[in-house]
A protein has these predicted regions:
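Short, solvent-exposed turn/loop segments enriched in Gly/Ser/Thr/Pro and often Arg
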Residues: 7, 33, 190, 237-238
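Acidic-histidine catalytic/liganding microenvironments
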Residues: 214, 227-228
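Conserved G/P- and acidic residue-centered "switch" motifs that form tight phosphate/ATP-binding loops
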Residues: 10, 192, 227
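GST-like fold's C-terminal all-alpha helical module
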Residues: 106-222
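GST-like domain detector, emphasizing the conserved glutathione-binding G-site
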Residues: 1-139, 178
Length: 244
């Protein structure tokens, strides 16, 4: 049995929901509410000491870190649903290189406009002492919250994140223009699924212009959005808007 502890709007949770949908695997839903601090409760920290989402529990055993979870699902169910890793070693290496890049570049980069556009209002409503207590309770990313400060990320960090996101969409555009319709070969893979939530979030926070001049990237995004797994991962309440 698969149980997924996740947050509706979390990009890392969306990655795993996409993979579960593509694999056709049923799962028990355990939504985590950040506003209530449910990710920092002793019960949740016993499953995931990092205090982040998602966490997959498979037959009672927790698996943490979204990309690790996605690889785990493919490893234990390679012939169930869509195959998400190539069969050859070189193909798998290409996918893993993309996964490393996604973790290091677009995933942290998209947090900057996400936090500035979506979470700053609530963060400002907290007192300095409340913010300090929250940061102290957070096992990971203390530096991230301290840089966020009380006024959001400064312009130089916003500009840097935008440059990193532009690099990401240029790499997607180049990959699908040169080799195949997909990022790492002739078939969809974890590379496509794991970068998609960052692109969706860019759209949600008004950054679609970053890739509007990239036709192959635009086509890739349209094809990804048309897959049945998209609506299963990005259901009502899981998308955000700077107007919310």
């Amino acid at each position: 049995m698969f149980e997924l502890y996740h947050a509706h709007i979390s990009t890392c949770s969306q990655k795993v929901r996409l993979c579960l949908a593509e694999k056709g695997l049923a799962w028990v839903d355990h939504p985590i509410e950040f506003a209530r601090g449910e990710h920092l409760t002793p019960a949740y920290l016993a499953l995931n000491p990092n205090g982040v989402v998602p966490t997959l529990v498979h037959d009672g055993q927790p698996v943490i870190e979204s990309s690790v979870i996605c690889e785990y699902l493919e490893e234990i169910a390679p012939d169930h649903g869509t195959a998400l890793m190539p069969r050859d070693a070189h193909g798998r290496a290409r996918v893993r290189a993309w996964l490393r890049y996604i973790e290091e570049v677009p995933t942290p980069a998209v947090r900057v406009p996400s936090f500035n556009g979506l979470f700053l209002k609530g963060w400002r409503q907290m007192s300095d002492a409340q913010r300090a207590r929250y940061i102290e309770k957070t096992p990971l990313r203390k530096g991230h919250y301290r840089r966020f400060g009380s006024d959001g990320f400064p312009k130089n960090q916003v500009d840097e994140s935008t440059e990193q996101l532009r690099q990401t969409v240029e790499r997607i555009d180049g990959a699908v223009a040169k080799d195949s319709p997909w990022l790492a070969g002739d078939a969809i893979s974890l590379a496509d699924l794991c970068v998609l939530p960052a692109i969706v979030r860019m759209s949600d926070v008004g950054l679609e212009d970053v890739w509007r001049d990239l036709p192959d990237m635009t086509d890739w995004y349209a094809r990804m959005s048309a897959r049945p797994s998209f609506t299963k991962a990005f259901y009502p309440g899981s998308r955000v808007s700077v107007a919310d």
